[in-house]
Swiss-Prot record:
The keyword Transmembrane applies. Possible role in modulating immune responses. Induces morphological changes including production of filopodia and microspikes when overexpressed in a variety of cell types and may be involved in dendritic cell maturation. Isoform 1 and isoform 2 have an inhibitory effect on lymphocyte proliferation. Keywords: Cell shape, Golgi apparatus, Immunity, Membrane, Phosphoprotein, Transmembrane, Transmembrane helix. It holds the Pfam family LST1. Induction: By IFNG/IFN-gamma. Up-regulated upon autoimmune and bacterially-induced inflammation. It is found in: Membrane; Golgi apparatus membrane; Endomembrane system. Signal peptide: none annotated. Residues 70-86 have a biased composition (Basic and acidic residues). This is Leukocyte-specific transcript 1 protein. It comes from the Eukaryota. The keyword Heme does not apply. One of its GO terms (biological process) is negative regulation of lymphocyte proliferation. The chain crosses the membrane at residues 8-28.
Length: 97
């Protein structure tokens, strides 16, 4: 017959093992759910890719390679000479700290 201390150790170990197993199952379920959601978002993103995104270079009015970004050939010519003080680097330099 086992002593009382041995029983506590056995049942405590089984309880902790059960909790660990439960945690692994819950984390696996969350990971599977997240994986399915990412796949669904990727599919919806691929279907919506017909709309062109703004390319960083187009936002800075820089030349954009023809394979990337929107076609800017027909844009308004007024906005090409912007105030250079509006550039992020200039704002960061002039910002009082």
């Amino acid at each position: 017959m086992l002593s009382r201390n041995d029983d506590i150790c056995i049942y405590g170990g089984l309880g902790l093992g059960g909790l660990l197993l439960l945690a692994v199952v819950l984390l696996s379920a969350c990971l599977c759910w997240l994986h399915r959601r990412v796949k669904r978002l990727e599919r919806s993103w691929a279907q919506g890719s017909s709309e062109q995104e703004l390319h960083y270079a187009s936002l800075q009015r820089l030349p954009v390679p023809s394979s990337e970004g929107p076609d800017l050939r027909g844009r308004d010519k007024r906005g090409t000479k912007e105030d250079p003080r509006a550039d992020y680097a200039c704002i960061a330099e002039n910002k009082p700290t």
